[in-house]
């Protein structure tokens, strides 16, 4: 097709002429209409729907502050800690940039956890939004990697020994584990080579992947449309112009709405940065203000709070826990075998149960702890196919479903708390019970999600004007 210059009306302003010139070469106005002013979102979105926008803002904060930190940071084991102190003491407003970055890391996980919780209770992972959910889980996985690689960079005591513990976990993988952990470290111990590797991953590799996944997440969302608290597809009810009857343009209605909540969020964010940047040791640990010492292990090594639920599951997987864990998994597989009609599926369930029995006998608890910790994240990718409920939203599910979700949230919080605490026999038992419930919530979902009496779902969204 031949190139055509976009025409402007006579007497158009200079700005209109410039925009027409740009649009002829890059469809900026068309993209704005498609993704903002003519993107129709359900009119009954509530408080839980602000966290996606907040996550984008925090991502921008992290990228901008990270750029300024890298200008003065030295990825050298002999200079890393001193360079952070130099940023804090000598660089103009360096303390502010560093505290914004460290606070942003924790707040990123706060808004992402809330964003995922909203998707969980309102069924935002159900058809046709499976790909949106998968991209979201991939973002979460990348975010965990980004946080882990960045955690080593201050080269403090907790950074050093935390990295040592986590990298050593890879050695538990049969056959390839020792070589894999050696490749990650770049040496036989965490040192200068490790720091340079982690710096490259944290500053270049993962941010590029993260930005790409965020773009894919948003594009997939705008292709199928946003979910809503009722789980009703607004595209099923269109007006004469082909617009959803229960939808409103994202801009200006939700963009202005989100700006109001963004103001409140930034007040909280600034309050933490200026008055409690360490948050009692949860955002910045006291041991990380001590230079890394390979010859002195801290009395208690614990990850940052946003990793602790998964770390708690890792620590709960002891030798004594393997038998109860196998019994639990065998029961789940037995339920799948009973439900399945195909004899091949029944046989596969029995074979998996026997293979797990052999694996629990031959492989040590450390390996299975790594499997449980990794599996607890990976299992979220399969949520769209685990939930067999006839309705999406928790609003129309049986009452006991709400209790199942509520106990799941409490279990996750308990695991997070126990992951910070020093190990003890009592905490170990509680962690094991919570681990079983966490896994059971997902693995048994095909069964419990279909039980009970479901409320009728309305044909249109429920909405009350303010």
Predicted regions and their residues:
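Membrane-embedded and interfacial regions of multi-pass energy-transducing membrane proteins
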Residues: 2-107, 111-466
